[in-house]
Amino acid sequence: TLMQLLEEGRNVVLLTSFGALTNRVSIQDIDIKDIAKQADFFNVPLCLVPLYPNTDYKKRIEEAFKVIEDKTGLQVKRLVFGDLHLQDIRQWRIKTWAEYEVSTPLFDVPYEELLSRLWKLVTDKNLAISLSTEIKLPNASFPIGTRFDAELVHKLGDLGIDQMLENGEGHTLVMPKQRNQ
């Protein structure tokens, strides 16, 4: 999604909310320092939105939109999400952000195509993908840091797990490879 927007010459700002008490993206369990490294690697501005317990999520995000507009001089018109097939989440986003164009360009794209594009991006940009959360199953376990590659995707499929982890079975972290890898 990000690469496509950048290739189209779009003005892109990466907006990420995180737990203010943990400095981590809550569900994915990713440290905001890693989010900053991603933004730097892809050369996109980053807007971090700290969320405290009992925070009004929509209000905080809208405040961030205002900051982005003030800093860039551009109006936020379109919100882009990487959702793959969870219709309830997509509909929530569309309803919550009704005053914006909500785009989900990866929605319902077949996994074979998504994975092909992902592996090409990993190679072209020299990226590494690993699990940012542990996957615990009755007959298998994959710890944090496990490489998310074609072999793991195949294993997940054999275990009846969504190969893109779209149902919350686990989450991934994409980072530039270290020079010595």
Sequence positions of predicted segments:
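Nucleotide-activated chemistry modules centered on ATP-dependent adenylation/adenylyltransferase
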Residues: 1-181
